């Protein structure tokens, strides 16, 4: 009996102390809610920023789809004032995981998204404070984005996001391209 008890204790000890177990991540069907924000075209003054939220889901091949919405504010200097351009866009995209560490704590993905939304310049007011008239008009915009995103798992359910994205939107009377640098947090809900 002592021999079996000793064998049992040895096996259990080896099982408990032989290595560290990690939670499984990027499983098919897992879903998360993302909150993100950052700078648009650098952090020049006046401040250009974006903020957004998204829902993402993981596929059987450890990739993910993303559906979300975003608000982008970019200011253009005019004399000693700024003229704001705001974009409200919806996004639908797919991200491919191409790199991860052995512990499955850090993942690097590249993705493409389709974007569509509305852009307003100076909140629809075409007359500036000095009597000048803006030629830029409010418009519907459409296009896409390419994103490089790093996901770092802080816990099994909380993920820190860092990304760089290049947006291209047609229909705008101002810039065609916008570069974004940002951070975010994702909460795994399923």
Where are these regions (language model features)?
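Short glycine/proline- and aromatic-enriched beta-strand/turn motifs that initiate or cap beta-hairpins
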Residues: 21-74, 186-190
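Membrane-embedded beta-strands of outer-membrane beta-barrel proteins
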Residues: 51-55, 90-94, 146-148, 152, ...
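Extracellular loop and loop/strand-boundary signature of outer-membrane beta-barrel proteins
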Residues: 38-41, 76-83, 130-136, 168-172
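Extended low-complexity acidic/polar segments
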Residues: 123-163, 187
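Residues that define the transmembrane beta-barrel architecture of outer-membrane proteins
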Residues: 29-31, 45-51, 82-90, 106, ...
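Gram-negative (and chloroplast) outer-membrane scaffold detector with strong preference
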Residues: 54-129, 187-190
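Predominantly the C-terminal beta-signal and adjacent terminal strand-loop region
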Residues: 72-74, 149-190
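Cleavable N-terminal export/targeting peptides
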Residues: 1-29, 190
């Amino acid at each position: 009996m002592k021999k079996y008890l000793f064998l049992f204790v040895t096996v259990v000890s080896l099982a408990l102390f032989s290595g560290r177990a990690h939670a499984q991540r990027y499983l098919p069907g897992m879903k998360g809610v993302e909150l993100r924000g950052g700078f648009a075209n650098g952090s020049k003054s006046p401040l250009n920023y974006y903020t957004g939220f998204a829902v993402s889901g993981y596929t059987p091949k450890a990739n993910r789809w993303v559906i979300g919405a975003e608000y982008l504010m970019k200011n253009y200097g005019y004399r000693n004032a700024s003229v704001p351009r705001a974009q409200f866009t919806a996004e639908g995209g797919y991200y491919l995981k191409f790199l991860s560490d052995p512990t499955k704590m850090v993942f690097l993905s590249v993705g493409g998204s389709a974007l569509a939304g509305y852009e307003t310049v100076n909140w629809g007011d075409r007359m500036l404070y000095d009597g000048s008239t803006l030629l830029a008009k409010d418009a519907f915009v459409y296009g896409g984005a390419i994103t490089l995103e790093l996901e770092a798992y802080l816990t099994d359910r909380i993920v820190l996001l860092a990304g760089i994205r290049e947006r291209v939107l047609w229909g705008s009377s101002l810039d065609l391209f916008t570069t974004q640098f940002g951070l975010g947090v994702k909460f795994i809900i399923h």
